[in-house]
Amino acid sequence: MPRRLISSGGPWEGRFGYSRAVAVGDQVFVSGTTDAGPDGRSQHPDDAAGQARAVFGIIEHALGEAGFSLADVVRTRMFVTDVVHIGKVTAVHGEFFRDIRPAATIVVVAALIDPSLLVEIEADARRSSD
């Protein structure tokens, strides 16, 4: 089955050798996504909700490039750098997925690739055959 590689032009994709998303058949896997700009720093410093909103927008765009939508998402994984961000990030998750209700995990991590980044999110989607 052929793989379709999707890039968002993020600062590390080419350098580190990965794709924003990989579509294979009826599935697409979206890599850990932050709101990092070309300089690798957050576009919404000190704003976990703003970062999450931007990240879900990037994920939505990557899904669209693969012919999928947020409605196809079956799992999300959210990583935050402090427990104080959980409520803000999960509230934004609810804005995007309230009716879709994918399986979801949120984990507190020690740090992300740049200190200005507070949130990183992955998503897996599967197109329904019904």
Model-derived segments and their meaning:
Residues 1-57, 61-74, 80-130:
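N-terminal presequence-like segments and the immediate start of the first folded domain
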